[in-house]
């Protein structure tokens, strides 16, 4: 194996005499730092490879002249083979990949792949689905002519290996013997990590034309899939941004930060969407995997120097098959060893990322019995060559980084390609050489997961269909299906392990290939208290996030004795109208995630809320918050109840005798955003749009210059501003010294100015903005501040009796905690039971004086276990403290949340805490304990 790899080396331009000396710029070059280099000239550019293939000398000269030091390339990528008919990037663009100052838009990248695929039968190109803004993702397939011609056979074989129930041992052995594995590479997911879409164009050409033994091995024994730009909207936005602001930037300190938006909604969290599948790009990439079932997926990112190959520090997610964990180590060690042997410093593994959270793009494969991997390659984001100075922590010698990066170096876009491409080729080469083992492991892991579902508890989850929050139940069941997990409905009643099953209940049987993934989604997470700081959330338990019931069954007999029917389409659970006569309809409060949609669907029907309990009959008493519908159109109400999953009681007027009600009049809403962080407000916009809510979207730079806000709006929603953010940072915004900084659409930069625009994003909201918010509330508006956004009204004194606790010893890194309803008649608590799960990450931790505790709607549980899933180190200090609070200020209200109730569109069970604030915006003082 080693000799075949060594023979793949092409030109070996890393000569001893130049290996450690600084690079020299080409003579006459004025830029500082230099953009081109001549270290290679004394050795010349060979015209052919050691295996006799002609070299594209013009392309190769550009590769080398844009590489800052000889140690930053190797014999795999220090040249490019020539071909008389296959279109190279230089043939298409007029220059090689990695040219200083050049990044390509999506259409240009796709244009090249179309040209490449049109010139060789070893490359195919096709468009995938569209993003929210109408740009397509794309798929590039590279392999031998024979392998590409039988892709349908390969797809069928991989799908058979993924389901051992339908494939015998003998059939699996035949498939493993006959088909190549598919290795999938994703580029450009994080838009300001700009190198991978460039690199993949050259890599595809090299795979198509090179006769190097290494490349021939890959072509014959593997098929490479590439998604060159996983986030097309953000790619174009970023390319425009760097052309607009960084074209003449040659110092990292002078770099203008990237665009405020990537996709329409989602920023960096597009790599945290694997659990909820909200973004179109995530949906497309999951769909791609479920269609092809490729055994290896590899996500290309950029950050730390020079090339980090993922394994992670642990603790690893306990549902990952040990084979997969071993494959992580095996592959990464091979890549680190190979590139280090080529003399390339700074290639390492282990000490970055944990391996616990399953919502990353690479975990689309890890959670489904395949291998998920990622790179972090050193990158500048903008395409100019600049000097980079590294911290000591990045340059220390460690067991996992025996050859560290330099303290200071010149770094170029071409260097980025020179590291990323040979790493990826080395990994695909390893898979091709070990084709049978990769496929056999894929089969074994699928079989292991299936067998665990048959032999280890839980053997099933029962999700009752008849729950209060029918919409939430259906949403969870549908999301499980979209994840590729098989769902059933009970065809009969029964009792299994003390769990009652009714006909029509949803059954998640664990005897299926994705049992391990189903388990990690459904069960409690217990993150070790002594583990290093996790890379992301440590809890995501579906039933808790959706605030629905699901019961684990510990007895395997349910798999053999309960008759079930497979679910083959998305489900809905209809509501119903009970009672035969009456003039009034009472809607049972349920705090469902579609509460706002349901209210909007009623249109002009008068709707009010009962502020106390209401007795329907001697057996049924509704909690505070029941809706009263005044209409004579019974069919309209029945259709509405069925569609939205609500239980409605038809009663006579006398049922409401003595009841206190208030109107649920729909407010005019504005969503306030900052220019420093659009990530969390993007999730809020997504959620509002899913609810069909109309709202105005206003930036911090405008809010103080719009006149009286109350003349325009009733509700001002200010979403979470990121973990541990402060009022000072929120208020100050972007540094004025960096301005003026426009984000506006122009003919030169057509992707800018959306979803919002600004002629100057710096300077924050200013005192004018604070005064505008204060006046808005005093004049009768409701200001809703979520998560860290609540620090703004708190630290600037808009609320006198509420403060933020210092919580140095409290560590809650994205967990699900137990909340309790402090006042059942508080409008913010309408529809919730005595307790509810609350997503929480790093505060803020609220404290309310005893004189104002009537404003507490939800508190963290005061007794028993606080943590429902995850970890809360030092969480005892949070017990009994407020989580959701409202207070009347002037004629209006301020509502604050000590957590993000709209987190990544995951915690749907918390959404009604926001919807209740919107629907009851001018009656938040209602109830016996209120200040109405």
What are these regions (language model features)?
Residues 20-31:
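Signal peptide processing junction and immediate N-terminal pro/mature segment
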Residues 204-208, 221-244:
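Carboxylate/His-rich catalytic cores and anion/metal-binding grooves
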């Amino acid at each position: 194996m080693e000799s075949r790899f060594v023979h793949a080396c092409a030109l070996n331009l890393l000569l001893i005499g130049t290996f450690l000396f600084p690079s020299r710029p080409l003579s006459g070059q004025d830029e500082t730092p230099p953009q081109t280099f001549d270290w290679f000239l004394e050795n010349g550019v060979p015209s052919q490879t050691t295996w006799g293939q002609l070299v594209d000398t013009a392309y190769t000269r550009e590769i080398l002249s844009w590489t800052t030091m000889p140690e930053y390339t190797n014999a795999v990528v220090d040249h490019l083979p020539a071909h008389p008919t296959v279109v190279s990037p230089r043939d298409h663009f007029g220059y090689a990949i990695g040219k200083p100052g050049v990044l390509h838009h999506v259409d240009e990248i796709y244009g090249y792949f179309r040209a490449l695929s049109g010139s060789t039968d070893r490359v195919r190109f096709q468009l995938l689905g569209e993003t929210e803004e109408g740009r397509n993702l794309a798929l590039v397939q590279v392999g031998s002519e024979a392998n590409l011609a039988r892709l349908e056979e390969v797809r069928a074989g991989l799908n058979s290996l993924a389901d051992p129930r339908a494939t015998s041992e003998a059939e699996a052995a035949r498939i493993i013997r006959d088909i190549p594995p598919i290795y999938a590479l994703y580029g450009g997911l994080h838009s300001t990590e700009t190198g991978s879409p460039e690199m993949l164009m050259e890599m595809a050409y090299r795979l198509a034309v090179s006769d190097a033994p290494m490349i021939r091995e890959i072509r014959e024994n593997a098929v490479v899939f590439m998604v060159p730009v996983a986030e097309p909207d953000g790619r174009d936005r970023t390319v425009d941004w760097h052309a607009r602001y960084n074209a003449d930037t040659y110092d990292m300190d002078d770099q203008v930060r990237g665009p405020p938006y990537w996709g329409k909604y989602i920023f960096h969290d597009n790599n945290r969407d694997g659990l909820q599948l909200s973004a179109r790009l995530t949906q497309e990439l999951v769909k791609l995997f479920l269609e092809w079932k490729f055994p290896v997926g590899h996500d290309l990112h950029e950050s730390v120097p020079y090339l980090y190959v993922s394994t992670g520090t642990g603790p690893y997610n306990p549902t990952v098959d040990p084979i997969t964990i071993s494959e992580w180590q095996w592959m990464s060690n091979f890549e680190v060893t190979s590139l280090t042997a080529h003399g390339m410093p700074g290639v390492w593994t282990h000490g970055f990322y944990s391996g616990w959270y399953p919502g990353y793009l690479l975990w689309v494969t890890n959670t489904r019995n395949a291998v998920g991997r990622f790179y972090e390659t050193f990158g500048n984001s903008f395409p100019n060559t600049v000097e980079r100075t590294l911290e000591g922590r990045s340059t220390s010698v460690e067991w996992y980084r025996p050859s560290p990066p330099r303290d200071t170096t010149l770094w170029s876009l071409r260097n980025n390609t020179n590291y990323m491409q040979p790493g990826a080729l080395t990994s695909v080469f390893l898979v091709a050489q070990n084709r049978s083992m990769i496929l056999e492991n894929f089969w074994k892991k699928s079989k292991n997961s299936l067998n665990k579902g048959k032999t280890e508890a839980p053997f099933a989850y029962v999700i009752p269909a008849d729950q209060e929050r029918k919409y939430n139940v259906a949403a969870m069941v549908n999301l499980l299906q979209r994840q590729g997990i098989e769902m059933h409905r009970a065809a009969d009643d029964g009792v299994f392990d003390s769990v009652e099953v009714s006909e029509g209940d949803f059954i998640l049987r664990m005897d299926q290939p994705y049992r391990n993934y189903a388990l990690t989604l459904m069960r409690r997470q217990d993150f070790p208290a002594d583990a290093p700081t996790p890379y992301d959330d440590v809890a995501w338990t579906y039933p808790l996030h959706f605030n629905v019931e699901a019961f684990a069954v510990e007895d395997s007999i349910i798999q053999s004795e309960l008759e079930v029917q497979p679910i083959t389409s998305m489900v809905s659970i209809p509501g119903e109208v009970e009672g035969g006569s009456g003039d009034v309809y009472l809607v049972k409060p349920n705090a469902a995630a579609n509460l706002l949609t349901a209210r909007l669907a009623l249109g002009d029907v008068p709707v009010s809320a009962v502020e106390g309990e209401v007795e329907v009959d001697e057996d049924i008493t509704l909690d505070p918050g029941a809706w009263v519908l005044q209409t004579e159109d019974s069919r309209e109400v029945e259709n509405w109840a069925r569609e939205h999953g609500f239980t409605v009681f038809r009663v006579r007027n006398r049922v409401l005798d003595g009841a206190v009600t208030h109107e649920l009049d729909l407010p005019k809403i504005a969503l306030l955003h900052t220019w420093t962080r659009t990530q969390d407000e993007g999730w809020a916009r997504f959620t509002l749009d899913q609810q069909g809510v109309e709202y105005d979207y206003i930036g911090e730079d405008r809010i103080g210059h719009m006149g009286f806000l109350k003349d325009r709006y009733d509700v001002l929603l200010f979403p979470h501003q990121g973990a541990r953010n402060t009022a000072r940072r929120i208020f100050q915004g972007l540094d004025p010294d960096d301005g003026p900084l426009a984000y506006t659409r122009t003919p030169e930069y057509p992707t800018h100015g959306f979803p919002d625009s600004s002629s100057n994003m710096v300077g924050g909201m200013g005192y004018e903005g604070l005064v505008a918010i204060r006046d808005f509330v005093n004049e009768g508006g409701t200001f809703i501040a979520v998560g860290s956004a609540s620090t703004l009204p708190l630290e600037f004194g808009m609320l006198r009796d509420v403060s933020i606790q210092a919580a140095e010893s409290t560590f809650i890194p994205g967990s699900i905690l137990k909340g309790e309803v402090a006042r059942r008649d508080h409008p913010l608590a309408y529809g919730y039971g005595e307790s509810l799960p609350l997503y929480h990450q790093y505060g803020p931790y609220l404290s309310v004086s005893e004189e104002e505790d009537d404003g507490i709607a939800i508190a963290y549980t005061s007794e028993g276990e606080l943590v429902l899933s995850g970890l809360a180190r030092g969480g005892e200090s949070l017990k009994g403290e407020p989580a959701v609070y409202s207070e009347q200020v002037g004629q209006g209200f301020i509502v604050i949340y000590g957590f993000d109730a709209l987190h990544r569109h995951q915690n749907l069970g918390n959404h009604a805490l926001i919807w209740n604030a919107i629907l009851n915006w001018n009656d938040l003082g209602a109830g016996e304990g209120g200040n109405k």
